[in-house]
A protein has these predicted regions:
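Mid/C-terminal beta-alpha module of Rossmann-like enzyme folds, strongest
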Residues: 172-228, 244
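Conserved Rossmann-fold NAD(P)-dependent oxidoreductase catalytic core, especially the SDR/UDP-sugar
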Residues: 33-75, 94, 111
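Active-site Tyr-X1-5-Lys
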Residues: 71-94, 110-116
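Glycine-rich NAD(P)-binding loop of the Rossmann-fold in SDR/ketoreductase-type enzymes
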Residues: 3, 22-33, 70, 74, ...
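Flexible, glycine-rich beta-alpha linker
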Residues: 74, 113-134
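NAD(P)H-binding glycine-rich loop region in Rossmannoid oxidoreductase-like domains
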Residues: 1-26, 37-40, 54-55
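C-terminal amphipathic/interface module of NAD(P)-dependent oxidoreductases
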Residues: 187, 205, 228-254
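Substrate-positioning beta->alpha
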Residues: 128-134, 148-170, 176-177
């Protein structure tokens, strides 16, 4: 085989019911075993699905780039960055100070292997089971969206764009590195609701309920284990814009 794509892992738990160690056992421990296998195998390329949450739980400034110093919050992001660190400890990744005489360059050329750490933001497409599925069910059932008072911008990754990037990494000569992944345009949650309604031929019902009231409801939802809790409210209403400039440049995408 020519490549290994490692996308198995434990997803972020919006209900906060999973034991922290389970994230490290799966997202870190499993990655270590698979990467060790890759290094001993004849495969030339390794693609590891990390997450933007390994870089930052929230975005400071206009957008999140690969230059950020990772500061994950919680076991999901922490387990992902731990896996990234293991990969970088066992394979020569380019650095800002790399040059032609760098031993990192020599090691990479000798092994003739390439390693890609992908950090996609929230992925959307058929079969989505996360917060986007919650939004879909809200629209499908005709339930009014009560969070219209929250104005935000958030990056998403379509499954089609993600597959296109994977194909590019497998078929083109792309340098080893860390790459963020997101669609070109960031959307607000309200815009996303409107798009879903249009796709299903429904009228959007977006209510601008008081922010403080909705935050209180989310807090109650955390205590009662309801679908809308504090963590889910934050994820649905926060600003989280991710730059895709590096991966587009690497693949020659205008």
């Amino acid at each position: 085989f020519d490549a290994i794509i490692h996308l198995a892992g434990k997803a972020h738990d919006t209900k906060n019911q999973s034991a922290a160690q389970s994230y490290f056992d799966i997202n870190t421990g499993l990655t270590q075993k698979i990467f060790d296998f890759f290094l001993e195998s004849s495969a030339k390329k390794f693609i590891f699905f990390s997450s933007v949450k390994a870089a930052a739980d929230s975005v400071v400034g206009d957008m999140l780039t690969e230059d950020v110093i990772p500061a994950p919050v919680g076991p999901y992001g922490e387990s992902k960055i731990r896996a990234e660190e293991y990969i970088k400890e066992h394979f020569a990744f380019p650095t800002a100070s790399s040059c032609e005489c760098s031993p990192f360059r020599e090691m990479t050329s000798v092994t003739e292997k390439q390693v890609y750490i992908l950090r996609p933001c929230m992925i959307h497409g058929p079969g989505n089971k996360g917060n986007l599925n919650l939004l879909y069910n809200v629209v499908k059932k005709g339930i009014p969206w009560p969070l219209g008072d929250f104005e935000n911008r958030r990056s998403f990754t379509s499954i089609d764009n993600l597959c296109y990037v994977i194909e590019g990494l497998l078929t083109k000569e792309v340098p080893t590195g860390i790459y963020h992944m997101g669609d070109d345009e960031a959307l607000s949650t309200n815009e996303l609701i409107a798009i879903m309604c249009e796709a299903m031929g429904k009228q959007p019902h977006i209510w601008k309920m008081n922010k403080g009231f909705m935050e209180g409801c989310a807090g109650l939802g955390t205590l009662l284990h309801l679908p809308l809790n504090t963590e889910r409210l934050r994820k649905l209403t926060e600003n989280y814009v991710v730059s895709n400039a590096k991966i587009k440049a690497a693949l020659g995408i205008d």
